[in-house]
Amino acid sequence: MAQPAQHFIEDFFAKAGSLPGFSAGMEKVSRDEQRHIGFGVKVLYELFAESEECKAAASEMLREILPFTLAVMVPPNWDERYTTEYGFELEDIYAFGMRSVEMKWKATGYPLHDHPPGIYPFDPEMPHRERAQRQVKLLRAGVLGEPNGKPRVDPEVEGILFDVIARSADTDAIDRPVTFQWKFEDAEPYYVRIDNGSTSAGRGLADHADVTLSTTWADWVEVATRGYDARLAMLRRKIRPRGSLRQLARMPKIFPPRPASSRQPTGSLQ
């Protein structure tokens, strides 16, 4: 996780020609980390070649940690001078990091886009820079990363999250077209339609939704990105479902939940 930022800092001082002792030390750290990474990639390659169970364990770990590890590079109080003073932006770090991570997972023999739905729910055709911009927007809004109890919502943030949700759907878990509708007290309604192996997300009210979930934006973010148990949210009436009980019961298979977090929920789910 630290390697992308380290790369940019090292590059800055190398170009500036300042702090030669620091640069020499960073170069040694980089070589050491490359050995660690190479060892890890080799171990995973051998484990994945021998066992599908190891692949499943790796996928489950990624499902749990990725929404939080994205926040590692967020500067204190979102003061971007922590990066811009070194000549780069957060989006540069995230774009570089995604390219690097994708290459390393490909080298393990288990590329990220071969993992189950929801592990790496990004459009592979979208440029890394654009993906990075979307991630930073979700982090700024409090949808990903450190919980703030009051995740912000606007049309762009809502659209990005529901694109991720649609890409997270396991289309093999349904036997007919199905539509899920979200009605928010404090945001625009959204729906996800799964039909013939494809998924799409749209703003507004869908015709003949199979399941409708009424909730608030903050409560849904707790479930969608932070691993809060949707069943508990329903019992507490923070999420109020209506429609087909059969499709409602299938939702955990269609949208595999993230492992429950040990922390206390924020907002009204406390």
Which residues does each predicted region cover?
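Feature captures hydrophobic
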Residues: 105-270
